[in-house]
C-alpha cells in the first residue's frame, strides 16, 4: 500500500486560496495555519481561559463510551482530557448510514493524525474528538448510500420517512434496516472481508436504537485502536452543560446577527459566493417543539418559532433555557461558537464547504472575546483498487487524470489510436456531397409546387438521416471491436470519478473496507499522510 499527493495547484474555490495563497485571505482568520509556531500561540491563548465544565464533560464522555466494546484507548484519552492543560483536535459530521461518504472517515483520520502530531510538537496532551451532528433533522441527507450495479452507481435508500425529528432521537426502523443491509451486502462483491464486515454491521444494527447510535458504533469499530472520542451534539446531558453559553447567545442575539452579516459581506467582497446566505432575522438557534426541530427568528425584541404561533421575549427564552436546555440546538453559525466555548480546541478540521462558512465567523467569535479557531483542511483522498491500478500501469496513465474528471478524453483518444477508419470525415464528406447534389433537385421540386418543396425537404432530411445512421452504426461497431480495452477505461472512471464527482463524496466507507480490509484506516494512519491541503491517492 502506498500513497501520493497531487499538486495543490489543482485545487479550486476558496480552498485553493487558503492552501496556496494564505496571505490573500489571512484577514479572515486569527491564526495562520501554514506558519511555524501557531500551535504554541494557540496553546498559550487557551491556557488563559477557564474551562470550568471540563470535568463534567469528561464524566459525560466516560458514561457514553463505557458501553462500547474495545473502549480502552477511548478511556485513556478521556483520562488524558481531564488534565487541565489537555487540548483537543475536532471534526464533525452528520450521522450518515454506514458512516456516510468516505470523507467522513477521512475527517476522523485527520483528527487522529493531527492530535498525535501536535501532542509531540507541544509536549502536552492532545486528544482527537469527533462531533456527531445529532441535532440534524434532514433525514434525506443521511439515509442512503451508493452501490455499484453494473458500471453505474445507484442510490439505495433506507425506507424511513423524515418527520423533522433529530438524528439522535429518530428511531431506526429495524425491519427496513434489515432489508436495506441485505440489499447492500448483496451488492458487494464477495471478498475475504465481507463476512466479518457483515457480522460487525449486523451487531451494530441490533444494538443501536437511533441513527446517531448506529453511526457511532460503526465509527468506533473503525477507529477504536486510536481512541477516537465521540460527542453527540444533541445529547440532553450535554445540553445541560452548555446552558450558560446558550444564554450568552440569546442575550447577544442582536449583535450576533449584525456580526454574522458583516462577516459574510466581507467574504463575498473577496469574490466568493455566500456560503450561508440566510435572512437577517435568523437567530442562529433551533428550538424543538412538538418533537420537531424548528428555526428561531429574532425581530423587534422577540423570538419567533418558525411555522408556529410560539414566541418569546429574551427573558422568557432565557427562562426556557434554564428549564429545558435540551430543547435548544445550534446552527452553522453558533455551532462553532459552542464548540469554542465547550472544548479547549487546538484546531478544527474542516472540509471545503465548512472552511468557507468558518471564514465568515471572525467577527462573530470576537463578539464573545474569542479568536477564530485554527482551521486545518481535512484529508482529501481517492483510493485506487488493485484492478484499476493494474489497468493504469498497463497504459502508463496517471490516476490524477481520472480523479480530475478527464478520463473520457483519455478513453476517446485511446480508441482513436486503435483504428485508422476516418468515419467522421467520410460521413461529413458524404453529407456535404449529398447536400450539394440534392439542392438543385429540391429547388426544382419547389418550382413545381409548394407541396413538392416540403416533400423535397423531407427527402433531404431522410437521406441525411441515413448517413448519420450509418455513421453511428460504424462507430458502434468499432467500439464493440475494442470493448475490452474501453471497459478498462470505464472501470477506472467508475471508481476514480463516480457519477462525475469526487470519489470521497459518493462511495461509503464499507466499499473500501470490503476491498481492502476492516483495518484499512489504521493501516493508512500508520503511513502518516501529510496535511498540506493536497488531494491524496491511496493505492490499496
UniProtKB/Swiss-Prot annotation:
It comes from Shouchella clausii (strain KSM-K16). Its EC number is 6.-.-.-. The lineage of its organism: Bacteria, Bacillati, Bacillota, Bacilli, Bacillales. InterPro entries: Bacillithiol_biosynth_BshC, CC_BshC, Rossmann-like_BshC. Residues 457-477 form a coiled coil. Keywords: Coiled coil, Ligase. Involved in bacillithiol (BSH) biosynthesis. May catalyze the last step of the pathway, the addition of cysteine to glucosamine malate (GlcN-Mal) to generate BSH. One of its GO terms (molecular function) is ligase activity. The keyword DNA-binding does not apply. This is Putative cysteine ligase BshC.
Amino acid at each position: 500500500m502506498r500513497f501520493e499527493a497531487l499538486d495543490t495547484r489543482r485545487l479550486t474555490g476558496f480552498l485553493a486560496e487558503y492552501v496556496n495563497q494564505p496571505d490573500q485571505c489571512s484577514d479572515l482568520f486569527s491564526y495562520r495555519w501554514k506558519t511555524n509556531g501557531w500551535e504554541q500561540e494557540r496553546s498559550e491563548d487557551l491556557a488563559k481561559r477557564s474551562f470550568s465544565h471540563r470535568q463534567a464533560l469528561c464524566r459525560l464522555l466516560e458514561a457514553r463510551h463505557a458501553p462500547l466494546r474495545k473502549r480502552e484507548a477511548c478511556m485513556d484519552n478521556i483520562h488524558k482530557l481531564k488534565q487541565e492543560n489537555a487540548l483537543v483536535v475536532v471534526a464533525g459530521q452528520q450521522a450518515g448510514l454506514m458512516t456516510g461518504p468516505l470523507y467522513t472517515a477521512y475527517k476522523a483520520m485527520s483528527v487522529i493524525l493531527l492530535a498525535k502530531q501536535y501532542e509531540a510538537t507541544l509536549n502536552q496532551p492532545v486528544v482527537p474528538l469527533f462531533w456527531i451532528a445529532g441535532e440534524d433533522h434532514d433525514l434525506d441527507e443521511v439515509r442512503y448510500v451508493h452501490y455499484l450495479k453494473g458500471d453505474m452507481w445507484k442510490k439505495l435508500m433506507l425506507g424511513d420517512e423524515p418527520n423533522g425529528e433529530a438524528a439522535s432521537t429518530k428511531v431506526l426502523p429495524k425491519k427496513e434496516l434489515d432489508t436495506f443491509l441485505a440489499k447492500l451486502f448483496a451488492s458487494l462483491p464477495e471478498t475475504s472481508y465481507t463476512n466479518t464486515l457483515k457480522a460487525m454491521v449486523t451487531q451494530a444494527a441490533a444494538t443501536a436504537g437511533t441513527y446517531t447510535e448506529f453511526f457511532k458504533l460503526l465509527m468506533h469499530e473503525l477507529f477504536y485502536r486510536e481512541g477516537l472520542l465521540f460527542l453527540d451534539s444533541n445529547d440532553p446531558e450535554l445540553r445541560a452543560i452548555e446552558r450558560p453559553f446558550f444564554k450568552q447567545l440569546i442575550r447577544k442575539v442582536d449583535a450576533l446577527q449584525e456580526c454574522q452579516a458583516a462577516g459574510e459581506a466581507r467574504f463575498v467582497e473577496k469574490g466568493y459566493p455566500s456560503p450561508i446566505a440566510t435572512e437577517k432575522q435568523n437567530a442562529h438557534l433551533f428550538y424543538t417543539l412538538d418533537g420537531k426541530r424548528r428555526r428561531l427568528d429574532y425581530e423587534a425584541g422577540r423570538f419567533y418559532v418558525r411555522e408556529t404561533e410560539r414566541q418569546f421575549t429574551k427573558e422568557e427564552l432565557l427562562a426556557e433555557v434554564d428549564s429545558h436546555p435540551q430543547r435548544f440546538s445550534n446552527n452553522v453559525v453558533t455551532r462553532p461558537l459552542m464548540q469554542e466555548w465547550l472544548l479547549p480546541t487546538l484546531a478544527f478540521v474542516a472540509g471545503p464547504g465548512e472552511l468557507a462558512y468558518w471564514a465568515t465567523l471572525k467577527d462573530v467569535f470576537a463578539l464573545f472575546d474569542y479568536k477564530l479557531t485554527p482551521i486545518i483542511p481535512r484529508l482529501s483522498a481517492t483510493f485506487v483498487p488493485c484492478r484499476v491500478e493494474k489497468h493504469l500501469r498497463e497504459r502508463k496513465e496517471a490516476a490524477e487524470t481520472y480523479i480530475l474528471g478527464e478520463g473520457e478524453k483519455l478513453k476517446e483518444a485511446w480508441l482513436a489510436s486503435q483504428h485508422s477508419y476516418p468515419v467522421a470525415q467520410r460521413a461529413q464528406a458524404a453529407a456535404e456531397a449529398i447536400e450539394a447534389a440534392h439542392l438543385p433537385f429540391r429547388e426544382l421540386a419547389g418550382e413545381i409546387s409548394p407541396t413538392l418543396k416540403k416533400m423535397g425537404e423531407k427527402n433531404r432530411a431522410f437521406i441525411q438521416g441515413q448517413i448519420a445512421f450509418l455513421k453511428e452504426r460504424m462507430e458502434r461497431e468499432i467500439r464493440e471491436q475494442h470493448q475490452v480495452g474501453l471497459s478498462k477505461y470505464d472501470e477506472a472512471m467508475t471508481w476514480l470519478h463516480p457519477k462525475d464527482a469526487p470519489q470521497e463524496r459518493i462511495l461509503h466507507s464499507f466499499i473500501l473496507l470490503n476491498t481492502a480490509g476492516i483495518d484499512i484506516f489504521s493501516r493508512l494512519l500508520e503511513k502518516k499522510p501529510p496535511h498540506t491541503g493536497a488531494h491524496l491517492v491511496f493505492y490499496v
